[in-house]
Amino acid sequence: MTEQELAISCARGDRTAQRELYDQYGSRILALCRRYAADPADAEDLMQDSFIKIFRVIGRFKWTRPGSLYSWMARITINMAFDSAKRRRSLARQLVDVD
């Protein structure tokens, strides 16, 4: 299945296609998560959260060229990593303010 067909099938809720997408891109997304996460457990959580979001919004994906699916998934993952870091910093500031 091409990446374009894979994205369309995932958008239709095809569980087999979702499994294929995860199997095909999971290790690359996890490697990306490890660059942004504080520790391995955080990287696993980030990857899981990223795939949940990817599957939720994959209907918005617009295929433009080979490799665009991974680029789109990577951008979602990076944005989620930045959002998570912002939340952690905000929480840390709140905890410091309480002291």
Give residue spans per PLM region.
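Arg/Lys-rich amphipathic alpha helix in sigma70-family domain 2
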Residues: G59-R60, T64, A74-V96
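Structural recognition of an alpha-helix C-terminal capping motif at a helix-to-coil junction
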Residues: D45-I52, R56, G67-N79
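A short, charge-rich alpha-helical start-of-domain segment used by transcription regulators
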Residues: I8-A31
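Sigma70-family region 2
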Residues: A11-R12, R35-A38, F51-S68, R87-R89
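Extreme N-terminal regulatory/targeting segments of RNA polymerase sigma factors
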Residues: M1-I8
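Conserved RNAP core-binding helix
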Residues: Q4, Y22, L30, P40-V57
